[in-house]
A protein has these predicted regions:
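Short hydrophobic-aromatic micro-motifs
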Residues: 30-33, 62, 67-70
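Sequence-specific dsDNA recognition surfaces
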Residues: 6-20, 37-64
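A structural connector/turn signal
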Residues: 56-57, 84, 129
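A short beta-sheet element
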Residues: 71-112
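Non-catalytic DNA-recognition/assembly elements of restriction-modification systems
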Residues: 1-21, 146-204, 209-221
Length: 221
């Protein structure tokens, strides 16, 4: 089943400040800006600017499970608010998505919005030339594929496992490359010593390190 986002979540604009933010380390409210979300769509609350907002109404505050949508930029992806966010607000031009958790899980909605197919669809609907923008109205009408909650959770779990596997493979590949580079360098150095040995008449004794390096390289590959 496909439904418009507006039927399963509330979409609202981030908080608009009338003047430049004045950070206060002792402030009672954390402010989330676009720069606080990295390329992997992860929010880093430890580095948030803080301000004093004594008259802030509670409905502006973020909750666990809210999605923070990048309405402008190269990608129009979403980050998920986790536990322990405390008193925090989202600034404009970002959009806040608050899912109806009786219908859709926040993690599934984030996965769906960030999926390459959805991102391609949003890119086609973005307005502007130099800076692309997705408006609240466009986002509200985004069609969301809505499987049962149990299936949503399974999809998220599988996607996370796949991401973890990919990260592990990339780490192993990087280590293998580093090992190969060390072996190649050692082979080159041993070959140089072998040549120097030949020059002074050491002959076969100097060839052994180079041979061992070459054999070790063959086994590694």
């Amino acid at each position: 089943m496909e439904v418009a986002l507006t039927r399963i979540a509330e979409v609202r604009m981030g908080y608009s400040f009338r003047s430049r933010l004045e950070a206060d380390a002792q402030g009672d409210v954390a402010v989330i800006q676009m720069k606080d979300i990295d390329d992997a769509n992860l929010l880093h609350p430890e580095g948030l600017a803080r301000i004093q907002m004594s008259e802030l109404k509670d409905h502006h505050l973020l909750r666990e499970g809210d999605l923070l949508f990048r309405s402008r930029g190269i990608t129009n992806s979403a980050a998920l608010v986790g536990k322990g966010i405390g008193r925090a607000i989202l600034t404009a031009p970002m959009l806040l998505i608050r899912p109806n958790t009786e219908i859709i899980t926040p993690a599934y909605l984030q996965w769906f919005i960030n999926h390459p197919a959805t991102q391609a669809m949003l890119a086609g609907q973005a307005a502007g030339t130099a800076v692309k923008m997705i408006g609240k109205g466009t986002l509200n009408q985004l069609k969301i594929t809505l499987p049962p909650l149990e299936t949503q959770r399974l999809i998220v779990k599988t996607a996370r496992l796949a991401s973890s596997e990919l990260a592990l493979l990339e780490k192993l590949q990087a280590r293998r490359k580093a090992l190969l580079e060390r072996i190649l360098l050692q082979t080159a150095q041993n070959a140089r010593r072998h040549q120097a040995g030949k020059d002074v008449g050491l002959g076969a004794q100097a060839t052994e390190p180079a041979k061992r390096s070459t054999q070790r390289l063959s086994k590694q590959l």
